[in-house]
Regions:
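Short, solvent-exposed helix-loop connector elements
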Residues: 115-120
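Retroviral integrase
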Residues: 1-114
Length: 120
């Protein structure tokens, strides 16, 4: 298990995950420095849709040095690899045998679901 170091600057390392809530899919993006997270509703689960949402976050906060995700097909596609190269960030995936190694995003998903449940 590789533990991720706390970065020196906000939004230099972000973790992301996709979750389902009430039959809809959402993308969570969490800043490793502060723990701040943001959520987007996804119209579908394609790499193109995930990339579009990430570009919006990057246009506000700047592109990260490192993005951590699971091994979902949205993140392992050639299109996503090209996106990482074009936007010049390092993409790190969690271990396929141990997806909990993306714990920061997993915790943000739990918090997001709790907040959404309270506001529902």
């Amino acid at each position: 298990l590789h533990l991720h170091e706390v970065p020196d600057l906000p939004w230099s390392t972000v973790a992301t995950d996709i979750f389902e809530w009430h039959c809809q899919h959402y993308l969570v993006v969490v800043d490793s420095y502060s723990g701040w997270f943001e959520i987007d509703l996804l119209k579908d689960l394609t790499s193109a849709t995930v990339i579009k949402k990430l570009k919006r976050h990057f246009s506000v906060h700047g592109a990260p040095h490192t993005l951590i995700s699971d091994n979902g097909r949205q993140f392992t596609s050639q299109r996503f690899k090209d996106f990482a190269s074009q936007w010049d960030f390092r993409h790190v995936t969690s271990s396929p045998e141990y997806p909990q190694s993306n714990g920061l995003a997993e915790r943000a998903v739990r918090s997001a679901k709790q907040l959404m449940e309270k506001s529902h």
